[in-house]
Regions:
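Terminal end segments
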Residues: 413-416, 428-442
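Charge-rich, well-structured scaffold segments of protease-associated domains
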Residues: 1-160, 226-400, 456-459
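Short, hydrophobic beta-strand segments
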Residues: 10-18, 187-189, 209, 255-257, ...
Length: 459
């Protein structure tokens, strides 16, 4: 299904691919019946709201790989083509506000009926070679080009406003960083893992993969996912770690909860984040079944990745002897992580796993140092200042942040057997973090190594 508004006459298209001469004529009747069945009960208002929120968020965040300038040019041309106003689709707040007002009026039901219950223009394309008398015929389509009366130049853009400086403050036991911005709102929570043991970080990494499958006292896992899809653009819990630029190159590790959303839904974001992190049921029969299911799937996925990306796993494994960041990467996503998964699956003591998750949640969410990063407007910041102190994120006192550490093991020569039919031989040297060396390594991989090993050597 597609909607094309890049032409003077916008079109709504329903395309059935892979149809046969027998099934193609039944397509229009099937669409009519499906629409009739849907209109019998009406389009659910919560689904319409979720769709509108998702579309509005996409119009602000611009997902995908196209540069914002290219998208703005397309939107400006489309708005100018249909309405004479190039700026209409560049500022969509009024457009979506008017659509939200129509949610409870039945307007969307009437629109669906008008578009899809009317007799459609149906085209059935049957592949065939062109006939001789068609090869020299005039083209059925004549392309034209619209000309702008007043094309913009770089001079029309001006210098633009400089970004406002960020601010730091203490709020509800957390360090709040505000980065002034317009458009979508980004709210990230960073719980410090400096006081965690290596094994605890492994359990936390598993927990972030399992949370989506677990219920809360208020919602089932599926209901909570629907709520997140309705009110948030993106939301994700994960382990983040990196080597800092401070003296000694410390490794910083955080449990992160990231959300992107429309500013008016900030109250929903705080409520959903609190429920997802603090109230998820980590014990009981349903949770234990989810543990076994998710970990078994993860084990299978890793075994497939060993075959497809054995070189990457070998590089991580070898580099783990030289830096804490690499050691932690190996611990949560490398061969060590795979062995940890196998051990848990072999023991199958899911009650103990749930108890471990509960203890870690208490330790981190209520006591670890918390940094809240807020990208949004001043009005949004004022709203956050009111919401955060009364939420589950608030604590009277928290610990201080510190670097994550673990003891590095001495380098060893290792070999692993995988059923991939490809051998990987990896050599690793310790190297201080240096931009010039990174450039040299990239040049070698593109030039010398690629040519001499891949092309000349035939590897």
């Amino acid at each position: 299904m597609g909607f094309d508004d890049s032409t003077l006459q916008p079109t709504l298209e329903l395309v059935l691919r892979g149809a046969t001469a027998e099934t193609a004529p039944k397509f229009a009747a099937g669409v009519k019946q499906a629409v009739t069945d849907l209109l019998a009960g009406g389009i659910p208002e919560e689904l319409l709201l979720a769709s509108l929120n998702a579309m509005e968020f996409a119009s602000l965040e611009r997902p995908g790989s196209l540069p914002d300038g290219v998208l703005d040019a397309i939107y400006a041309a489309t708005g100018w083509l249909h309405t004479g106003d190039p700026a209409l689709l560049l500022h969509t707040d009024k457009l979506f506000a008017s659509l939200r007002e129509k949610l409870s009026t039945g307007w969307f039901n009437d629109l669906l009926k008008e578009l899809l219950l009317a007799e459609p223009v149906q085209v059935i394309q049957t592949p065939a070679l062109p006939r001789k008398d068609e090869e020299d015929a005039a083209p059925a389509r004549t392309d034209g080009k619209l000309v702008l009366d007043h094309p913009l130049t770089v001079a029309d853009l001006g210098d633009g406003d400089r970004s406002a400086a960020g601010t730091v403050e203490q709020l509800a036991g957390a360090e709040l960083l505000h980065h002034p911005s317009k458009g979508s709102l980004y709210l990230n929570f960073y719980y410090d893992l400096g006081e965690c043991t290596p094994e605890e970080v492994q359990y936390l990494d598993l927990l972030t993969d399992i949370l989506d499958e677990l219920d809360t006292p208020e919602h089932t896992a599926r209901e909570l996912q629907t709520q997140r899809a309705t009110w948030l653009g993106n939301s994700m819990a994960c382990i983040s770690f990196w080597t800092g630029r401070q003296e000694g190159s410390p490794c910083h590790a955080k449990l992160t909860w990231n959300m992107s959303l429309l500013e008016r839904n900030l109250d929903k974001a705080i409520a959903l984040g609190s429920e997802y992190l603090y109230k998820t049921c980590l014990t009981g029969p349903k949770a234990e079944k989810a543990f076994a299911r998710v970990l078994s799937q993860q084990k299978l996925n890793m075994e497939q990745q060993f075959i497809q990306q054995g070189n990457s796993y070998a590089a991580v494994r070898a580099g783990a002897h030289f830096t804490v960041e690499n050691a932690l990467t190996e611990r949560v996503s490398g061969v060590t992580a795979y062995h940890f998964l196998c051990e848990l699956l072999e023991k199958a003591d899911w009650a103990a796993v749930g108890a471990k998750f509960e203890a870690l949640r208490e330790k981190l969410l209520h006591h670890a140092q918390l940094t809240v990063s807020f990208h949004g407007s001043e009005a949004g910041l004022d709203t956050l200042r009111k919401l955060l102190p009364g939420s589950a994120f608030a604590e009277a006192e928290r610990g201080t942040a510190c670097a994550y550490t673990e003891e590095l093991t001495a380098p060893v020569n290792e070999a692993f057997i995988i059923d991939g039919g490809v051998n990987y031989d990896l050599l690793v040297w310790p190297m201080e973090r240096c931009a010039a060396r990174k450039v040299l390594a990239r040049v070698m991989s593109y030039e010398y190594l690629w040519h001499h090993i891949r092309e000349v050597g035939g590897a």
